[in-house]
Amino acid sequence: MRLPSPLVVALAALTLGGVPSAAAQTMEPMSYSNAPIGLNFLIAGYSHQWGNVLADPSLPVRDVEASVDAGNLAYSRIIDVWGQSGSLAMVVPYAWLSASGEVFEQARSTSRTGLADTSMRLSVNLYGAPALSLQEFAKYQQDTIVGVSLFVTAPTGQYDPNRLINIGTNRWSLKPELGVSKALGAWTLEAAAGVTFYTDNDAFAGNGVRRQDPLYSVQAHAIYNLNPTLWAALDGTYYTGGRTTVNGVIGDDLQRNSRWGGTLAYSIDRLNSLKLYYSSGLAARTGTDFQIVGLAWQHRWGLGL
């Protein structure tokens, strides 16, 4: 049985994260869609990021140019939540980072390799996406879906307090999000708004304490189903807030940044899908003006597929 196009790689955007700045700015088309209860997904992804990836005005580092290659492994399962569909997902990324810039006006370069922070997500569709069996799902037609998600990022990534640049963040983050998806013939329009809260990093650049205000974000997607096995999306996001305080000193790093990108997803067969994505900075007040390109493979199983 070949599943409808909206399900193709709908969860692969989970593998976008590789470094903190990128993880905070990911764009995820098809995040709020329906799928049969009991399906499992294994996702393997690779991404390459380059540019001002590691911008952090609270560090004595300027003119940073970096490249990050990240491999990601994710698992997700579709679940029944009080008669509505939902999903549980977990992503473990591994990153290879190289960077150059000026530290206290001296040219420096460095490289890092190791685990990045692990992410988890719970999503629940509140309206328009009932819990369905595989047979029931074959007759399902999307109209309007309203859902919520909770993203949690754990400080499992490589972190050395004596280094200015790290792969991990040494803090937790929590992001609740509200999303809406509307099907209009071959088109699907999707929008989501969320806010990310951060715990303190109490081992910042030695024994310093770094705090960060909440980061508010909105994203929108225009998705077009080219045929039953292929869809494409135009993606955009805007985020603001996130000002930092280091050892009581408030930073001049309020974010008002935007990004745009595109996504192409293809269903190879009833069990395997591929997704290609790209995004770039559109306007950046405090740096983080980088580009990212990635490829994700998704395998699904369960329900006798």
What are these regions, as identified by a protein language model?
Residues 20-43, 128-144, 302-305:
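Outer-membrane beta-barrel biogenesis signature
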Residues 38, 65-72, 113-120, 144, ...:
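Residues that define the transmembrane beta-barrel architecture of outer-membrane proteins
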Residues 40-42, 86-90, 120, 144-150, ...:
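Transmembrane beta-strands of outer-membrane beta-barrel proteins
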Residues 44-46, 73-77, 120-126, 150, ...:
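Residues on the lipid-exposed face of transmembrane beta-strands in outer-membrane beta-barrel proteins
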Residues 46-52, 92-98, 126, 152-158, ...:
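Transmembrane beta-strands of outer-membrane beta-barrel pores
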Residues 49-70, 107-108, 161-165:
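Surface-exposed strand-loop-strand hairpins of Gram-negative outer-membrane beta-barrel proteins
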Residues 52-53, 83-86, 130, 186-189, ...:
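Repeated loop/turn-to-beta-strand initiation elements of outer-membrane beta-barrel proteins
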Residues 205-305:
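Outer membrane beta-barrel transmembrane domains
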